Amino acid sequence: ECLGFGKGCNPSNDQCCKSANLVCSRKHRWCKYEI
């Protein structure tokens, strides 16, 4: 189970959906698309 776009996340334990190119923003602490 991974976190979708805009979901709150923990930068030190990034559980955002890698298959959707999502990463946890250290600044905003939510899943965003990796550029």
UniProtKB/Swiss-Prot annotation:
The keyword RNA-binding does not apply. GO terms for molecular function: ion channel inhibitor activity; sodium channel regulator activity; toxin activity. Expressed by the venom gland. The keyword Methyltransferase does not apply. Disulfide bonds join 2-17, 9-24, 16-31. SUPFAM superfamilies: omega toxin-like (SSF57059). It comes from the Eukaryota. Keywords: Disulfide bond, Ion channel impairing toxin, Knottin, Neurotoxin, Presynaptic neurotoxin, Secreted, Toxin, Voltage-gated sodium channel impairing toxin. It is found in: Secreted. One of its GO terms (cellular component) is extracellular region. IC(50) is 42.3 nM on rat neurons. Monomer. The presence of a 'disulfide through disulfide knot' structurally defines this protein as a knottin. Inhibits selectively tetrodotoxin-sensitive voltage-gated sodium channels (Nav). Does not act by binding to receptor site 3 to slow the inactivation kinetics of sodium currents. Belongs to the neurotoxin 10 (Hwtx-1) family. 22 (Htx-4) subfamily. This is Mu-theraphotoxin-Hhn1a.
